[in-house]
């Protein structure tokens, strides 16, 4: 039986959700968008609202040229000031093919320097599809929508040990239809996942399998059982890059004209808020909401 609890109304949310009180020195966030195979415009609005509603962040948005055939002159006008922000939330996916859209090299270098010098990054869902030919980006994401020849893959066995599948072996990336599934916390001691139940339900998500990449320095926080390939797939992980911290979540699927069910999940919202704070500061002080999902019950919140 699919159990769903939906929290409605501002008063109910404030009482039941466990929102942190607004903080005086808010964390500065830049969301980058402009291209994605998902509904990035609606997704950015929802990500921004989730972060701002926590009372912990100020959020700006920087949008790239939205046309894959954009001219050099159009791209020359896009020069985000990453250094102005404590953390960048990446909602951009210009395509997984090596020939797909890259950022101008000047911007890529600025982003690399930003993270190397201590800037935080949050990669949301399809953001790890992008930039197959950008080596530094691949180091930041660890795993992405890359084929078996690109690099190793990681799965979690039934003893909760991370298993490396060598380059050239295993599966190419893919996913089945969106469905409800159970998330499992692998590291309950990390600030992002602290206090979460060992298992909790997440709704109507796209569960990706067979991702490949450098897979270096990855610390996996959560995983989920893929019924499509009968393996445990990493869902959330963190990677150090220089002095910076990168948090990747595979949650947050939002298709064009599709429901925003995944982003209304209290579990997703908690991961996003905590992951963004952690990427920026190395801490996660956002309390576990009282309406957090359980092992058997999905919990959703209006945004």
What are these regions (language model features)?
Residues 5-16:
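Bacterial N-terminal signal peptides
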